[in-house]
Regions:
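Phosphate/nucleotide-binding beta-alpha loop and adjacent structural elements of enzyme active sites
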Residues: 1-256
Length: 256
């Protein structure tokens, strides 16, 4: 895939390889709407941040802009997307950003199957049924007149790719991590499995969590209970302005 460069409204430059529309949408979520801030989430000097589902690196870039002394560990399993992530970290000469070409899940698996959407790379997933209705079953919401064209143009091209996944606890063990000040998770339906990969001894090391939760099969309730059982106070915010064909998606904010 050929990486292109975009300049956003705030002057920030970055490389991307999927659609310009998706890249601008992610920028808006992170930099304009600042969806990973607020709700008692705080990024402080010297914090250790885990960016799980890093995509092309916009959240990692955002974190380093907010707090240059933060240390970021960024995880992206899809190889073509990971290569763009590398280019963006190099473009901005970011220090203390450690990149991993793997995802996080409930097990260590060198070849977990993902559905990769080259034109919508941030939607690549192990659970494509969570994110999209079948194209032929789409019922277009009146507020989204262009959605059919977007589905046709951006989601029809897809491929199955084998990617490495690891448990969060295996990474904590390998790196000797004592504290994760913020755990950010955006993994397109795999979030419950990410939490399952945390051993009991490692939960106290995690101080704050921001996660996008795809609420299917009671997943939101399961995750909320798991976090409450491990000492977190939780706030939820439902994402609006999504077509009715998408599963309900929430932003979850958890602090101790």
């Amino acid at each position: 895939m050929i990486a292109k460069k975009i300049t956003f409204s705030n002057g920030l430059e970055c490389y991307y390889s999927s659609s310009k529309e998706e890249t601008e949408y992610i920028f808006s979520e992170i930099f304009t709407e600042r969806q990973y801030e607020g709700h008692d989430i705080v990024i402080k000097e010297g914090d250790v941040i885990f960016d799980v589902g890093a995509n092309i690196g916009l959240f990692s870039i955002f974190v380093k802009g907010v707090e240059p002394t933060a240390k970021v560990f960024a995880f992206e399993p899809i190889k073509p997307t990971f290569e763009v992530l590398q280019k963006n970290i190099h473009l901005h000469s970011l220090e203390d950003v450690v990149l991993f070409n793997c995802g996080l899940s409930s097990e260590n698996n060198p070849a977990k199957i993902f559905t990769f959407y080259p034109n919508m790379s941030a939607n690549s997933t192990t659970k494509p049924e969570d994110t999209l209705a079948e194209l032929e079953d789409i019922q277009v919401d009146q507020n989204f007149p262009k959605i059919e064209n977007l589905f046709e143009e951006f989601f029809q091209e897809k491929e199955q790719v084998a990617c490495e996944v690891r448990t969060l606890s295996s990474v904590i063990n390998e790196l000797g991590i004592d504290s994760i000040d913020l755990l950010k998770i955006d993994v397109e339906g795999e979030e419950y499995e990410v939490f399952q990969g945390i051993e009991a001894k490692d939960w106290p090391k995690i101080k704050q969590i921001v996660a996008e939760i795809h609420d299917k099969k009671g997943r939101l309730k399961q995750i909320s209970q798991m976090l409450a059982d491990n000492g977190f106070k939780i706030q939820l915010e439902k994402r609006e302005l999504l077509p009715s064909t998408f599963v309900d998606i929430f932003h979850l904010y958890a602090v101790r």
